[in-house]
């Protein structure tokens, strides 16, 4: 029996002390984790509870069919984050406009961007799906967040990560000081450190691409994919194609095993 289990709460508190944080970022992550636990529970019942499956008959801003669980997860993450006083504005793949914090709640110093349920069209066929999130410091002085706060480049991210809902539910995140993964232990309802200090192998053997888009690729992209398939590449043998159609699942595999997305 392992008595050295490190919970996410302990890990984030250790990190907070190490870098002198105030706890605001920790509070945001805690709420993301709460929402993820609820989503994980709903996904686990997707084949049993009929009103979870299927689409709602409209498309999102990306032109994708909106699934019922998309709508549920989107509202869940918004409601988990909008009242805690640590966030000034949010943006979601499921929303056309910025998500403002209600007037009755205090505004914080962080901006949260998320895709509540990536790969949701895979729900009906029991394929891995996930949540993607990124967190920025606001750049405006205070009050309601603005479009300027939202449209920051990726290099300005304060922290980012994803949750994959699969045979197990795993959270992977980084603040620029290493990458750590936590698995949800259903027996206690807590995320525990399962993948400490993740490093991607220097050389993998997998590439992940939707080759149905081949006719629309630029010539350089086509040539690169053909290079990976050939024996002329640095592996001296063809790469293996693995494409699930859920970014979180494809990226997670390639992060752990090595590969190209």
Regions found by a protein language model. Name each.
Residues 1-48, 58-59, 71-261:
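IMPase-like, lithium-sensitive Mg2+-dependent phosphomonoesterase catalytic core
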Residues 53-68:
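Short beta-strand-loop/turn "lid" adjacent to the catalytic site in phosphate-handling enzymes
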